[in-house]
Design a protein with these regions (language model features):
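DNA-binding alpha-helical recognition surfaces that contact promoter or target DNA
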Residues: 38, 59
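Short, glycine/acidic-rich hinge or "gate" loops at secondary-structure transitions
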Residues: 50-58
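Divalent metal-dependent phosphate-bond-processing catalytic cores, especially two-metal-ion Mg2+/Mn2+ enzymes
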Residues: 1-10, 16, 20, 24-31, ...
Length: 157
């Protein structure tokens, strides 16, 4: 889907986020997404990526559970919820798209192992897909409303 949806820089950031999104998982870490974002920033700098790619990867790693958490715990019909999610990706529609794709890939990779808590919370299904899509749409709408209201200059492609 790279040629249709993302330019090379955004696609690179998405792939790197996919590789690094769980880098913060280890014993005694309570928030592996935040821990992973700190590590991702260092890794991006050491690998010589430009500031934009490094920022996108850091945000995606930090927020890689957020869309699923919002979708299963908040009301997408509440405009404040869509706005809150939009702020997590700096109101950037491309970052929101990337977060959606990362969320789907991460959720789809989880098995339905009976004893595995993370599968119960984040595993993928048609039901979860519909919830995530509704929340994604709510955030996208929040960004669109702000653009039309003159708050930002964003190309929705």
């Amino acid at each position: 889907a790279r040629g249709e949806r993302y330019d090379d820089r955004h696609y690179t950031a998405l792939l790197l986020a996919g590789l690094l999104h769980d880098v913060g998982k280890r014993p005694f870490v309570t928030d592996h997404a935040a821990e992973g974002a700190r590590h991702a920033a260092v890794i991006m700098k050491r690998m010589g990526f430009d500031a934009d790619i490094a920022r996108w990867v850091r945000i995606l790693v930090r927020e890689h559970l957020t869309l699923s958490e919002f979708a299963t715990g908040k009301n997408p019909n509440d405009p404040a919820v869509g706005e809150s999610l939009a702020r997590c990706v700096d109101r950037d529609p491309m970052l929101l798209d990337m977060l959606y794709d990362l969320t789907r890939a991460d959720g789809s990779s989880l098995g339905a192992t009976a004893g595995e808590e993370i599968s119960k919370r984040y595993g993928w299904s048609h039901w979860r897909e519909s919830l995530v899509r509704a929340m994604y749409s709510a955030a996208r709408e929040s960004i669109r409303v702000q653009v039309e209201g003159g708050y930002a200059d964003v190309d929705f492609g």
